[in-house]
């Protein structure tokens, strides 16, 4: 199966900072998926690395330039994961989908970050999945699925086990699009998922759920066309 993962930067690089063990655990999960015969692509977010830089830069510059800073942070995080993957990856972070596809055609795990200002890595992962005709998009984040409202702000939020892409659009329609913003699925990514009719799964960004996402045994939300 051809699977694209959107790996949240905040799960790879939490507030506590880089952890060799944490990064290695993710690398081992992706290696195992490759060994199982899956073609694996990973789009890594900027997470706290990006937000720290952006919060300072925002005092001096505009959102577009802050986006550029965020993109560089995603590529730094990508390089960390690439280093942990060893021979299963290529020591290069592609900046466009054509170069990304070349890496996949080398039978390697593809790891990349952001590409353009105003595009979150969720949107990049959805577009990549459409570009390579992936069978599945998995969004691995710091929330364990899609809720009817933001569970971080609403104690009565209800997790949805299964929704369709139109329902996803309704839920995500009013989310923030500023540099460094971090919703479960951002509005642009939701539109691409709907347009491309992508089967998508949103799971808690831990190695166990990443492995379970290629089966029906995950604990997240399944989004169907």
From Swiss-Prot:
Any coiled-coil regions, as ranges: none
The entry's keywords: ATP-binding, Cytoplasm, Kinase, Nucleotide-binding, Pyrimidine biosynthesis, Transferase
UniProt note on regulation of activity: Inhibited by UTP.
Gene Ontology CC, one term: cytoplasm
Enzyme Commission identifier(s): 2.7.4.22
Pathway(s) the chain acts in: Pyrimidine metabolism; CTP biosynthesis via de novo pathway; UDP from UMP (UMPK route): step 1/1
Sequence positions that bind ATP: 9-10, 47, 51, 141-142, 147, 150
Subunit structure: Homohexamer.
Role: Catalyzes the reversible phosphorylation of UMP to UDP.
HAMAP family referenced in this protein's UniProt entry, alphabetically: PyrH_A
Name the record gives this protein: Uridylate kinase
Natural source organism: Methanococcus maripaludis (strain C6 / ATCC BAA-1332)
Lineage, uppermost ranks: Archaea, Methanobacteriati, Methanobacteriota, Methanomada group, Methanococci
Gene of this entry: pyrH
